[in-house]
Structure formats: C-alpha cells, structure tokens
C-alpha cells in the first residue's frame, strides 16, 4: 500500500514524460489468478474443481496449494521456460490502483485442450490467454459441456465479433456493471 495519493504525485501537465516511483513500505505476496480463486471458492462450498491452467517454472508451490483444497491438478501444465503470471498492484489511500501485469506462462494456455470427459458438469472460461479463451469456448461447445463465459479484465482483448461468438456458445454470461457496458459497446 502506498501511504499517499497518486493524484498528489502525478503532474497532469507532465504525463507525456511520466517518470514516477512510489515507495510502498508494506508488501504482501498472495496466490491468485482466476482458476485458483474459483477452485478455492468451490472447495470451500463443498464442490470439486478440475483446474485447467498454465503455470511457470516457479509454480510448484501453487500446484501443492491447489491440491491441498482437494482440487485436481491433472490439467495444470507447467511451462518450463516461463514464470507464472503475476501482478504487482499498488493501492493508494483512496483505493486507487496501479497494476503491472506479466502474463508469463498464461500466454501458452491455448496449448492445453479441454478434456472430453463426461463427468464435467459445468466449466468456467475466465480471463486467460486470448487464444485459449477463444479455443476453449469452441472446444467446450463441441464437447457439449455447459459453460460460463466470464471475460472479466480480458474483455478488451476481443473484437465485437469474437465476443458475440463466445457469448453465443456459452450457456451463461458473467460480467460486472462496467464489463456489461463495455460488452454492449463492443458488440
């Protein structure tokens, strides 16, 4: 957390040459990511998750954490020449945030195909690599596995036509108010 206000550190007439640093005296490292967050929540609700995700060569502790919830990691792929996706988020005292995001291994998520298993009752396509989200939507539809399309922060990656197709293929759509407005404008 930055103990001040970003607005007091950024000179509006100088943003074209922005070069600013924020001292953040506290740091927390947490596990996150859509697949992990969904699996964690599902486990705490008594459900069983089958996680399909990509991690980097630094992801073994996350695999162990997912397994500790009772979730399957059968479809978690480790990309040895990448780091796991990660975000550095700085929050000021007004809860404004600046985020730097490195997709890392997530950029290879499309190399894992949706498993054709009869025991999958519902899938969720949440923010992931762009190509993976498109391919997995089609693969789920082809396998007749019902799914939720939750584009979240990945929504800006897609054209209006791509979004319409994924919405058409999906059984459910999950967006917040802002994402809903953006989806409406893009389509």
Regions found by a protein language model. Give the residues of each.
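Glycine-rich phosphate/adenosyl-contacting loop at the front of the ribokinase-like
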Residues: 1-50, 61
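Short beta-strand/turn micro-motifs composed of small residues
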Residues: 53-55
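Conserved alpha-helical elements of sugar-nucleotide-dependent glycosyltransferases
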Residues: 34, 58, 132
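Short, compositionally biased leader-like segments
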Residues: 57, 63-64
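Ribokinase/PfkB-type carbohydrate-kinase core domain
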Residues: 1-5, 50, 64-78, 86, ...
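Detector for Asparagine
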Residues: 19, 37, 57, 95-96, ...
């Amino acid at each position: 957390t930055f103990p001040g206000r970003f607005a007091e550190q950024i000179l509006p007439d100088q943003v074209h040459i922005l070069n600013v640093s924020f001292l953040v005296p506290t740091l927390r490292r947490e596990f996150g990511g859509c697949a992990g967050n969904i699996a964690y929540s599902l486990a705490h609700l008594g459900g069983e998750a089958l996680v399909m995700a990509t991690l980097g060569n630094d992801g073994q502790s996350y695999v162990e954490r997912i397994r500790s919830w009772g979730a399957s990691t059968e479809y978690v792929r480790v990309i040895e020449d990448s780091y796991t996706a990660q975000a550095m988020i700085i929050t000021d005292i007004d809860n404004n945030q600046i985020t730097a995001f490195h997709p890392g291994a997530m950029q290879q998520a499309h190399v894992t195909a949706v498993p054709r298993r009869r025991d999958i009752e519902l899938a969720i396509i949440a923010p992931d690599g762009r190509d993976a989200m498109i391919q997995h939507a089609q693969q789920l539809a082809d396998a007749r596995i019902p799914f939720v399309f939750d584009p979240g922060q990945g929504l800006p990656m897609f054209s209006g036509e791509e979004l319409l197709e994924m919405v058409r293929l999906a059984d459910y759509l999950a967006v917040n108010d802002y994402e809903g407005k953006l989806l409406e404008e893009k389509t």
